[in-house]
């Protein structure tokens, strides 16, 4: 896959872009995360022409309004940290944004593997995107042995964009 021509990145959040500091599957609180710099460094190395960085995440565990407000602060902070880091190394990064889906309903258009989050971001920035050929998604739900699902991979496939598992990306 030719990463150098990719200008638009959709990236999963949990276990892809961040991991918990506690080592637990689910965070203890909104501060229990560490941005995965090896992932950002690999993006810088492989995608020097990146213009757009979009975080897309299923968050079915968010039940209360307070949980959602706190998570919104968390994902905004992560987006800001990542965008600042990437912009310090990449000359072309223009846009960073995020969307997350709190629904556990598998038919919700925004819940991966459905494509609603990608469609919304693509539509919001479409005047700056030449083609879906410029897009790629990185995730950890790839249907590999030990993965809990293949929702990231299926989401990218249904949206007709390239996909790579974060573990494979780090080894590339």
Where would I find each of the regions flagged by the language model?
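Short helix-terminating capping/connector loops at secondary-structure junctions
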Residues: 3-4, 47-50, 91-96, 128-133
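Short, electropositive alpha-helical surface patch
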Residues: 63-90, 115-124
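Short, flexible/disordered intra-domain loops and linkers
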Residues: 24-31, 63-75, 108-111, 143-150
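Active-site neighborhood of HAD-like aspartate-dependent phosphohydrolases
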Residues: 1-54
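Substrate-recognition element of Asp-dependent hydrolases with the DxDx(T/V) motif
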Residues: 40-77, 95-107, 138-141
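A short acidic, often aromatic-flanked loop/helix-cap motif at beta-alpha or helix-coil junctions
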Residues: 105-112, 116, 169-172
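Conserved Lys-Pro-Asp/Glu-containing loop-to-beta segment of HAD-superfamily phosphomonoesterases
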Residues: 8, 110-150
